Amino acid sequence: MRAFEFWDTSPDQPDWRARLLQPLGMLYAQATAWRIAQKPGVRYGVPVICIGNLNAGGTGKTPTVIALVERLAARGITPHVVSRGYGGRLSGPLTVLPRQHSADQVGDEPLLLAAFCQVHVARDRGLGVELAVRAGAEVVLLDDGFQNPGVHKDLSIVVVNARKGFGNGLCLPAGPLREPVSAGLARADLVISIGSASDQSCFRQNWAAVLSQPYADKNATFQRDSVLPVLCGVMTPLQTGMDWSGERVMAFAGIGDPEKFFETLRALGADVVQQESLQDHQPLTPRLMRRLAQKAQQSGAQMVTTEKDAVRLPPGFRDQVLTLPVRLNLENWSVIDSAVDRLFENLDTRS
């Protein structure tokens, strides 16, 4: 989905275009609330951890899912991911097979995640969870299903880009939100805010009022009446042995925040002589790649992109483009570790 600049204005001073579209945003919020309230989510016999967001578009969910997969696996727990498969044409339910499926079939995010654990794509999330359980999942990570009411969530994590926060605080199309912040956080168990220390400080300052109010925990995971836990995380480049210092690069990215990717390259010492921001999930057609390759050649630069974009590269260009992988580092895993422990305790109690 295309993001508009006026979505990122201060929530205290929305742009005139946002104010003009605000009645439509209110209708969107009402429709979301109605859909969520229609029926209770179905339980499938294993804990379900939802990783979602309030904003439309990318906020760092995929790196968060990867971090959770690795954390759970390190504890001896077998996680499977269930995804809608945004950008793919197959409706599922199916298990992603990296050597057989392509991004245009199952979506770029499921194809990337399949390198870390079993991933199941299903337009009907419930059918996807059923498939995961039959395949041996001990816990299911529901990728981007926070506003989907069909599956019961035992733990709901809202991911937010600390730099952008919740934008102007308004719902689509007046702002970037799928639902009002207060309504979404009332169903969340914790928030993961991703960004630099300065971005984290600005996020907490701009959204202090809504983050500091107490929320009743409807899922009874934390049994808390305190404020919502907010965990801080930062994206760090994965050490691959590549020395980026002085490397002339033509960087392109079709993710939620391409500028963050370009900044990471510069921080590593790369000379970003050309950069191109693409739409999130934008198809990397041969025509587009030929144009980017020509720009790189004219600049004497090496093409480089993100892991998520790399899985969408046409076969003829895969050996021409370098990839810079990043991973999410959380400052404190103890809150999530304790929550996971309680999930399995609650499961034992129900059974």
Write out the residue ranges for each language-model feature.
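C-terminal accessory "lid"/substrate-recognition subdomains
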Residues: 1-11, 165-302, 349-351
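A transmembrane-helix-recognition feature enriched in membrane-embedded lipid enzymes
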Residues: 2-48
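Residue-level signal for inorganic ion chemistry
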Residues: 27, 62, 113, 143, ...
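Walker A (P-loop) phosphate-binding motif
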Residues: 33-101, 199
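Hydrophobic residues at beta-strand termini and immediately following loops
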Residues: 51, 82, 160, 233, ...
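Conserved beta-strand elements of the Class I
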Residues: 78-82, 158, 248-252
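Phosphate/Mg2+-binding loops and adjacent switch elements
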Residues: 85-217, 221-223
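Short, flexible loop segments at boundaries between secondary-structure elements
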Residues: 279-283, 320-350
